[in-house]
Amino acid sequence: MAESNFVDYVKIYCRSGKGGRGSAHMRREKYVPNGGPDGGDGGRGGHVILRGNRNYWTLLHLKYDRHVFATHGGNGSKNKSFGKDGEDKVIEVPCGTVVYNAETGEYICDITEHGQEIILLKGGRGGLGNWHFRTATRQAPRFAQPGEPMQELMVILELKLLADVGLVGFPNAGKSTLLSTVSAARPKIANYPFTTLEPNLGIVSYREGKSFVMADIPGIIEGASEGKGLGLRFLRHIERNSLLLFMVPGDTDDIRKEYEILLNELATFNPEMLDKQRVLAITKSDMLDEELIAMLEPTLPDNVPHIFISSVTGLGIQQLKDILWTELNKDSNKLEGVRTETIVHRAKDVAKLQEELKDMGEDEDFEYEYEEDADDDFDYEYEDENWDEEEEKK
């Protein structure tokens, strides 16, 4: 089976740079026998930075490059020369990426906008040179500060796709067919369940050049919230959606019951998903005549807008777009302006997280060695502990 290009989980090891050490150099020039201290400060270690990039929509580019190292700051030198700052390491991620501590499961941050930057690990501050420590009674300090140590962290990046409308339904409900009908997306379509194995996004064109984004996820089956089928892994991709479009085939024995099963699975996975706007689409309605549609109307849920559609004949497609646009632009669900649905992030269960990574082949042990250098064995003296005060004055 070919490996999927859609990667929404990745585990990476990050390490910031350590600060360069300050110089304890004493000025020595011809005709200047007592030049005094002139050691410069060490440079700052490089940060590890996360940056949102709308040109990415999966984490595939990080799957095979999972060791992220920023560079160390340079050491201070004579003539109050400051060390060079370490180079920051920027990790480009798709908008909608959530970051967790891989060891504790603790939520760290969330990237939701293009160009948004968050410092994941700060580089160590550079050590102060000896000229900072000169006083009236200590005019030739022969010591300096070392740089602050680096930081390291194992993190898990989890992608939750950003879309306005999320399609929810059982396998073979016609979700992919609808997406291919209303957008330029071309998901795989076939007459058997679980044709869709990964999420798909499509931009739906509306009137007067307006548009909205629709997300199709693999079909949900009863018990998906307990780990059955593919639905559980991909349910998180509709957590950010402003509106959920439930799709139930018209030839189903009990449309209301199937809708309630889907609703229950979402509630079990995340109760907050029930607060989202909902629309019910009865698909494959080209197989229903007007008399049968009239008989089904009284049996449909009362608390949700519904419409009969057919992606094959185009029945009700434009009306569906109108309903979706109206619901998206309600005061409680404004589409224009802020398009990102705010969600509450909770700490992850580490055991479940590791199990899911194992199922995806992402549980390999990371082997990395700390490279020692001359600074690690350097013997520093400390006679001034006012690190923060001195650093703030710079």
Curated annotation (Swiss-Prot):
PROSITE patterns the UniProt entry points to: G_OBG, GTP1_OBG, OBG
Cofactor: Mg(2+)
Matches recorded under InterPro entries: G_OBG, GTP-bd, GTP-bd_Obg/CgtA, GTP1-OBG_CS, GTP1_OBG_dom, GTP1_OBG_dom_sf, OBG_GTPase, P-loop_NTPase
GO molecular-function term, one example from the UniProt record: magnesium ion binding
Residue stretches making up the OBG-type G domain: 163-329
Signal peptide boundaries: none
EC numbers, comma separated: 3.6.5.-
Record: residues binding GTP: 169-176, 194-198, 216-219, 283-286, 310-312
Function according to Swiss-Prot or TrEMBL: An essential GTPase which binds GTP, GDP and possibly (p)ppGpp with moderate affinity, with high nucleotide exchange rates and a fairly low GTP hydrolysis rate. Plays a role in control of the cell cycle, stress response, ribosome biogenesis and in those bacteria that undergo differentiation, in morphogenesis control.
Known partners and oligomeric status: Monomer.
Protein name: GTPase Obg
Native source organism of the sequence: Phocaeicola vulgatus (strain ATCC 8482 / DSM 1447 / JCM 5826 / CCUG 4940 / NBRC 14291 / NCTC 11154) (Bacteroides vulgatus)
